[in-house]
């Protein structure tokens, strides 16, 4: 089944690495969502938080899975956490992918980020739940993401019942 995937990542810092992942996905006749032209992102930032939320909500529409591309500073990004929380609340499949091993435009790799995004919701007893407790995380380089990303997405979708 074809999946439409939302990609969440630290835009300013990791766009090059994120494009490597996205391009590997779309070359296999699949659809990516949540990628914006730099001018759209900058325009939304100028308009404020509500404009950014609206842009994210539009990107999440009709997606079954959200893939969080984890770079060195991703876990501290307000909007990535918002994307994770919305995806979790909506019952989408979720997964994390470490992208530090992908070379940037200058041929450099980066330090590994972490997947401690903070509380993403609560369980039936009102206790906090965290991304790392519920969702799998893969390493693009070590786990052969180019070959396996489609399988990771499918597993996340099935786990979410989608």
Could you say what each language-model-derived stretch is?
Residues 4-6, 105-162:
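C-terminal interaction surface of TIR/SEFIR-family domains
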Residues 59-71:
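Short, well-structured hydrophobic secondary-structure segments
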Residues 90-94:
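A short helix->loop->beta-strand "cap" motif at the edges of active sites that frequently abuts
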Residues 14-17, 76-78, 102-107:
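Short catalytic/ligand-binding loop motif for oxyanion handling, primarily in non-cytosolic enzymes
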Residues 8, 68-71, 97-98:
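Conserved beta-strand segments of the P-loop GTPase G domain that flank and frequently precede/overlap
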Residues 1-62, 146-162:
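Conserved N-terminal substructure of TIR/SEFIR domains
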Residues 73-89:
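Conserved TIR/SEFIR loop-to-helix hotspot centered on a Trp-containing motif
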């Amino acid at each position: 089944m074809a999946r439409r995937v939302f990609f969440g990542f630290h835009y300013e810092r990791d766009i090059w690495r994120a494009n490597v992942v996205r391009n590997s996905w779309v070359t296999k006749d699949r659809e990516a969502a949540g990628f914006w032209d730099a001018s759209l992102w900058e325009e939304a930032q100028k308009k404020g938080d509500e404009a950014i939320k609206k842009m994210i909500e539009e990107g999440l529409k009709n997606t079954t899975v959200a893939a969080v591309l984890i770079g060195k500073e991703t876990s501290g990004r307000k909007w990535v956490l918002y994307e994770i929380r919305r995806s979790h609340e909506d019952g989408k499949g979720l997964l994390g992918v470490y992208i530090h091993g992908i070379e940037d435009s200058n041929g450099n790799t980066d330090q590994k980020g972490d997947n401690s995004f903070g509380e993403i919701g609560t369980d039936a007893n009102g206790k906090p739940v965290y991304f790392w407790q519920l969702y799998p995380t893969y390493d693009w380089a070590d786990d052969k993401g180019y070959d396996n990303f489609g399988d990771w997405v499918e597993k996340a979708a099935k786990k979410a019942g989608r």
